């Protein structure tokens, strides 16, 4: 069962908003044979120009579903978030079920329901079943700090840069966010 943690910035989360979010995003449960125990982290932020930003993150066992949307209409934004999350689940479901069938395991996700196929509009310009890697590169990771990695990324004109963090000796990634600022992903072994 998906539980919800809903937080509002500059906005009070009313029962109507909470119910709408839970109803829409809760429909993702229909894609699973065994509904996972998961917590959907939902953050709703309003800006001075009345635009809203909705972020939803659902960490599952082997994948994290995440979608973000800005919209002038909160409810329309929630609908768009739901569509993005459903596309992510369908893509992931297809890959996992194919691997499960090849190994003879029980499928983790349910098969496509007829009503979902009828109501769905496919916004993807490519086949969800086929992942094609068109280019592969190999390079050595150089030890540096995150600031130097950002400079290297900008020099190369890339949106991300992989490097060995000099402080932790682990692999890290810096990336350019949509807002123009930078993010850092640090890896760890489990």
From Swiss-Prot:
SUPFAM superfamilies, per database record: Ribosome binding protein Y (YfiA homologue)
UniProt keyword annotations, A-Z: Cytoplasm, Translation regulation
Any one Gene Ontology BP term: negative regulation of translational elongation
Superkingdom per UniProt: Bacteria
Subunit structure: Interacts with 100S ribosomes during exponential growth, as 100S ribosomes decrease (after 7 hours) also found associated with 70S ribosomes.
Induction remark: Expressed by 2 hours growth, increases to maximal concentration by 7 hours and remains high (stationary phase) (at protein level). More protein is found in cells growing under nutrient-deficient conditions.
Full protein name: Ribosome hibernation promotion factor
Predominant location: cytoplasm
Family stated for the protein in its record: Belongs to the HPF/YfiA ribosome-associated protein family. Long HPF subfamily.
Cell location: Cytoplasm
InterPro entries registered for this protein in UniProt: HPF/YfiA_ribosome-assoc (IPR050574), HPF_long/plastid (IPR034694), RHF-like (IPR036567), RHF/RaiA (IPR003489), Ribosom_S30AE_C (IPR032528), Ribosom_S30AE_C_sf (IPR038416)
Organism: Staphylococcus aureus (strain NCTC 8325 / PS 47)
Gene Ontology terms for molecular function: ribosomal small subunit binding
Gene name of the encoded protein: hpf
Cellular component aspect of the GO annotation: cytosolic small ribosomal subunit
Protein purpose: Required for dimerization of active 70S ribosomes into 100S ribosomes; when added to monomeric 70S ribosomes stimulates formation of 100S dimeric ribosomes. Unlike E.coli, 100S ribosomes are present during exponential growth, peak during early stationary phase and then decrease (shown for strain NBRC 3060).
